[in-house]
Amino acid sequence: LPSHTAVDHTAVLPGLDNAVGGHDKLFHANGLTDITDYNDRMQCTTGKMGGLPDVNTENPDFQYYYLQYVNDLINLGARGFRYDTAKHIGLPSDPLDPRAERNNFWDVATGREAVKGLSLLMPDSLYIYGEVLQDRNVKEKEYAGYMDLVASSYGHALRSALNAGSYN
């Protein structure tokens, strides 16, 4: 889950803090502030969700650290990745956090772009999908350009129909 840390962000290991340039650079500018409006893309992609502090996924040092981890998993045999809460990581068209130069996490994480000379291993051989719950502020088409998506609206509609006994 690259987008958030545990509720107790002070328990983050020093190695991660050091890798990203310090604890203050690990989070978005409002990454320790609760999201109050999930229809606001800036809050949704940079704010604290459900008590979980929001990681500055646009920080190149974090991207490098994360990509090293993912490449280690690939070297161990992983051939696919599911991104939980993917809609909480910004897209290139989203508002830019004050601590970021650009929203390029998905370009790096899916192998379209290198970070600090490091690229995703075997990007064309991986299956990548993300939890992007459909809602008013979600840019499903843009996320779908990077990964397959969980069809949350379809699942909800199907469960509702089955529970109601309505099969039309």
Write out the residue ranges for each language-model feature.
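Aromatic- and acidic-residue-enriched segments that line the glycan-binding/catalytic groove
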Residues: 2-40, 96-102, 144-149
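An active-site-proximal structural segment forming one wall of the substrate-binding cleft
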Residues: 2-26, 55-81, 117
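Active-site-proximal helices and loops of the catalytic beta/alpha 8
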Residues: 3, 68-168
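Generic detector of intrinsically disordered, low-complexity, polar/charged segments
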Residues: 12, 18-19, 28, 44, ...
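Compositionally biased, intrinsically disordered low-complexity regions
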Residues: 17, 23-24, 33, 49, ...
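Generic structural motif recognizing short loop/turn segments at the entrances and edges of beta-strands
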Residues: 23, 51-53, 124-125, 145
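Surface-exposed charge patches in extracellular/virion surface proteins
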Residues: 23-28, 40-42, 48, 75, ...
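N-terminal small/glycine-rich loop or linker at the start of catalytic domains
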Residues: 33-55
